[in-house]
């Protein structure tokens, strides 16, 4: 009787998982960062903090309401290609956020980010398990969820501090 075969995986085998964990970090930091910068954002677009807070509320509603329908609509698309498109749209939307000088432009860009977010998390879990090295799917999924946790614990506080110091 032979002992079970141990698979050894180098760094290269973990690159897709690390990439997904980083994407989870960026998506979650992006989602929650405006909470800490709300007064700065409101001042920059010359709106009240309460009205500007709608960029957070509407974001949450868009994600909540569109996650299931958009997941169904994109179910037949190849996941890696879909993820790449989501990241491109996510990045472009953030460039619009960066240059938004009115509430309407900011809200429109945040809605686009929320749409990408609504699909991102629905495909992330199965994709994380699929790209992890053989036999390490649970660890791969945990690593991706770890990216989300690190966003909450480090990304948002550090991003808020930097945004308050140098401008959002």
Which residues does each PLM region occupy?
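Extracytoplasmic
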Residues: 16-49, 67-70
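Residue-level signature of mid-helix packing/kink "hotspots" within the transmembrane helices
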Residues: 32, 60-68, 152-153
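Small-residue-rich transmembrane alpha-helices and their cytosolic helix-loop interfaces
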Residues: 24, 56, 60, 87, ...
